[in-house]
Amino acid sequence: MVFFACLLGIFTRPLSYFSFFWPSNALLLGLLIRFPSLKSFGGILGAFIGYMGADLVTDNTLLMTLGLTLSNFVAVFSGLFFFNYTRAKLPASNNNVSELYPHIIAVTLGCFFGALFAILLLPNLPHSFMLAENRWIDFFTWWSGEILNAVIVLPLILAAPRWSEVKELINNQYVKEIQIRDALPFFALLISIACTHIFYGPGALLYPLAALIWAAASYQLFNLALINSLVCLTLYHSVTGLFIDQVNSSYLTTIISIRVGLIILGLATLILCVISQNRNQLYREVLYLANHDSLTETLNRRSFTQLSEKALKHKNNHSLSLIMLDIDDFKKMNDQYGHYVGDRALQHLSNIVKSNLRNHDLFCRNGGEEFIILLNNNNLNETQRIAERIRLCIEHQPLHLENCEPIGFTVSIGVLHIHLPTTPPLQDLIIQADQALYQAKKQGRNRVILAS
């Protein structure tokens, strides 16, 4: 990968020496951070061969190739050192923005030392493109270019989803369908990028700003990183093309200025996306706590009622089943073993029930030791089999606690099955299922009774 990334950088040199885009160092740093197992002799040797091979096959001299490779290695491994050092020193925090600090410090200092090493070594080599009298302009050109490359490439490596996550997303039948409004920020960005080529000038750097803010507030980090890279590369190409034609005498200082502007634009967009994701995550956590029972992590009664009312009215549902279950002699369990064991029994029951339900089935703690399940589009036989399976699983899977004998318990279950559309309100249906549960208790407990 390093070899092909180097070739890409070599083939994008607008002048005789500095590449327009050099992704290799950011790629290698990202891989070493994301996959620590690559920090082995074989991994480092492979990267070294990739750097050397790419320059040699493009007719660079051996000595110059070695000098460039060492400069790149200094940038990557000093950046890796500062990343590990900063992450170890920073206190743990729930703020996702603070997790960016090691990356920002690693890129800034790693690129600094890589550029410093390059200007101290390369001008002294034969056939060098660097001159001693231009050390500092070359230093800032190298440094700014490397940081911009990192802003473009590094987030793609670090935020890329794992293959298991990709497969889960593909196999998930309940993924929200992409709607036109989801693509509006991207379309706005395409329009703003096109404007940088049509109405180009120094202000072109700001054309995509509003669309980038919109995208940062709308998309996940990896998707935003892809968009951010596209915008930065496009702006870099269009704006530098303008100054190549018009400001040849101060090309390098102008390029440095453009790069700094793009670095700030790209980094600010990424930080905004992280802040937005952090806010959305906190909102989801608060919403989850508001809709679920804190002990069993099942739906609470209010949330269950709202979702069940929607299920009753949904046009695609042709039947509904309610399963009401209650732990037998739960008060005796609490009196004999204590409330801690009672709480663990409730958690044990909820875990067993969840393992026997589909993802979209509704499962609620109705109060105390009583639970209720709503199934949609099941026939009566399927519902009875599910209820009986749950009863048997609970009966034959006792609660295991440390330093304690297994504690077994049973449940009584009442089942109601209806065809839709139906007129009775939800509470009337729950009462019928509860009456069936009462009959199960009355007939000796640990059984399933169908509502009449």
Where are these regions (language model features)?
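Short helix-perturbing small/polar motifs within transmembrane alpha-helices
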Residues: M1-F20, L28-H127, L154-V166, K176-A204, ...
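Short aromatic-rich membrane-water interface segments that cap or initiate transmembrane helices
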Residues: W136-G145, I255
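Conserved nucleotide-binding and Mg2+-coordinating catalytic segments in signaling enzymes
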Residues: L287-E309, L325-H339, Q347
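Heptad-repeat coiled-coil signal-transmission/dimerization helices
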Residues: F304, S308, L346, S350-V353, ...
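Catalytic-core segments of nucleotide cyclases and related cyclic-nucleotide turnover enzymes
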Residues: D335, H339, L380, Q384-R391, ...
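Short helix/loop segment flanking the catalytic signature motif in cyclic-nucleotide metabolism enzymes
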Residues: A345, R358, I372-C393
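A short pre-motif secondary-structure segment
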Residues: L362-R365
